[in-house]
Structures are given as C-alpha cells and as structure tokens.
Amino acid sequence: AVYGNRAYDDGIIELREIMAEDGLRLVGAAAFVGEHTFSRILGGGRPDGEDLVIAEEFASEIVQNLLLSGAGAAGRVEVPGTPYPYSGFYKATDTSKKSVDIRKVVPQTDLTKCDGCGLCAKMCAMGAIDFTDCTQVVGKCIKCGACIKRCPRGAKYFDDPQYLSHLALLEEKFTSPRR
C-alpha cells in the first residue's frame, strides 16, 4: 500500500480481502509513504532513495521465502487493520477540528491559464472532467489531485474553504516524515 504520510487505515486488510475474494493469496504486505494526493508537501519527495532500498529489500525477502518454501507453503499473512466490517471512512475535519464534508468539492479552472489542452481530463481517474470542456466536472470527483498536479499551466485548483482548511490541518499535523 502507498499512503500520503497520514495513515493507511484499513487499506492493507481491505486489499487482502479483495485479493482473497478473487482467488489470490497475499504473500507479503507493506505500507510505503508517497506524495499525498491533496498536497505536494505531505509525503513530498517520497518515495526517496531510502524508501526504495527498503522496498527492494522487502521484495527480495518475499521472493527468497517463496523460492525456499514454495508458494503453496505460504500461510495467511496477518496484516494491521480492522476486519470486515472495516472501521469506516476517514472523517475530514478543519483546522478548528470541526467535521467538514468535502465529498462534493470539485476542482476549479483558472481561465486565464487554461489553454484547453485536455490533459486534466485525460489524467482524471474517474473520467469526471468533460473532454470537450475541461472546465466542467460532469462526474464524481474523488479529489485525487491528478488534474491539478499534471496541468502544465497550473490552471486547476481547489478553492472550497472547508477543503482548504482540511488541507491546512493535514499539512500542519502530518508533514514530518514517517518511516
């Protein structure tokens, strides 16, 4: 699992269960820090060289265990997290610790910067940005930030006050590097 320097919550246990439902068996699990989708500050510059060494060592250990004991010998991998029903979704709060609802927040477009290249629509994992008019969000936005981070002209941004307050809280609390 990769997470943005806050927490991976039940991500690994959920992934293990999804794999099992599809007939796959987990042979190892780890969580690594990567740049958070909301911010270039949270987990910025990660994974770094040290992270990559740790990941490579982890992968080598898994391969060695499989080569020595065979895939059939692998037992159930115990992972952190709350078994189904999982612990629920992360509850966003603002800087005053009040609960905020950012589900309907969508990216805005600075028309003075946008040249209509459509890269934001191509990068949108949900297909939420209209390909013919990339200023329009016509589907469900999951706030992954791909449109913002990949826009070559810096035209995409979030301006919702609750979202920005939540982002400020995350950057205040979770900027220190985690290993």
Language-model regions: role of each:
Residues 6-7, 102, 112, 139:
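Residues that cap or flank secondary-structure elements
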Residues 109, 115, 119-136, 140-142, ...:
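Iron-sulfur cluster-binding cysteine motifs and their immediate structural context
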Residues 1-100, 159-178:
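FMN-binding flavodoxin-like domain, especially the glycine-rich phosphate-binding loop
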Residues 84-126, 130:
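Acidic, Ser/Thr-rich low-complexity intrinsically disordered segments
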